[in-house]
Amino acid sequence: MFDTIVPRGVDQLMALTQAFRKDDRTQKVDLIVGVYKDDTGGVPIMSAVKKAEAHLVAAETTKNYVGVIGDAEVNRIAPQLVLGENAPAIMDKRIGAVQTPGGSGALKVGFDLINSIRPGAKVWMSQPTWANHMPIARDAGMQIDSYPYFRESDRGLDFEAMMAHLDAEAVAGDVILLHACCHNPTGVDLAMPHWEALCKLIVARGLVPFVDSAYQGLGTSMEEDVAGLRHLAEHVPEMLIASSFSKNFGIYRERCGALTVIAKDEDSVPLIMAALQSVIRSNYSMPPSHGARIVGTVFGDAALKAEWAEELEVMRQRIAETRVLLRAKMEELQVTSDLSFLTDQRGMFSYTGFTSEQVNRLRDEFGVYTAGDGRINVAGVGSENIDYVASSFAAVMRSEH
């Protein structure tokens, strides 16, 4: 059987991470994978999470199955976090939600749902987008196309090209995948006027928005990071939202996410939920429980919730301050390139615009590992390595002039 297996490409981020671990140089920096790191380079467990876990260990009495749709509390919390507690779709009982194995699981379940209803449906993705978006959609049977998004010249948003392309090419029933905030890999987000204009196009064209909300709370605030998403939800008849608690709770390996589906009316929700359960049952059967119980415990305790919110804000501020400091240090090194992109972009990632030659030189000569497209995890920069990172970046940028 396996003699005929077709070779598949290795995930480049995972390959780079393995290469970093095998690199025996003492002076090396990991700016590859999107996990929050503290100033010392550690990937910490939030204090509120540790306290919630301690409570769970003491109170838990069973490891029984949780059911196909997962944890009821997460399925209540997730829609409220992204839409707001009194969102019209929630008040009108037009939503269905299922807990999933992380945000990736939510995306896969969402695409599987779409393909089960409309086989071979097309999904439009930003160019560029998260490296795993396309494989997930492809393996779910979706057709994939892309729309312009990132403008190389100023490392900013090319909104006019995005709108013109979608207006000319997208047709009714197509799905458009959007990033709620902290766009991965670019860090370039839509502002509210962009969301408003895009919403009008989506409604006029009859498109179905699928919003990936993986970094809520790490851009500007818990509320502002989903303001555009909420505007969409108030104006479109149908919508899907993939939520992840990996980043804003720091529970990456616990795999806790959720898929929220907004239906056109209350009567459609039971049909959607039945379809979701069918998709899930034949896939992973039911999601893991531990991460979901952590989230539910934190949100069920006012003191823990307040502590979590404070910790998340500290994380957000550290990322924002690191952007400012990294730019300042590079300007002190008299880098002549425009570095405003470092402070204009938001969230964990920055799209540096480094060429493949610069990326290779950073890795081979300086031991500074970035993604192959030049994306860096800003949270990987701390007080112990920021001078080295700045000087390494400056060295490869000067070589281009």
Region locations from a protein language model:
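N-terminal "arm"/small-domain region of PLP-dependent enzymes with the aminotransferase-like
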Residues: 1-70, 77-80, 282, 288, ...
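Conserved Walker B
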Residues: 213-214
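Conserved PLP-binding catalytic core of the aspartate aminotransferase-like
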Residues: 309-365
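Short Gly/Ser/Thr- and Asp/Glu-enriched loop/turn motifs at secondary-structure junctions
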Residues: 93-94, 342-347, 371-374
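Structural signature of PLP-dependent enzymes
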Residues: 273-292, 298-327
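Hydrophobic beta-strand scaffold residues
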Residues: 31, 144, 209, 239, ...
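Active-site PLP attachment segment
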Residues: 228-271, 275
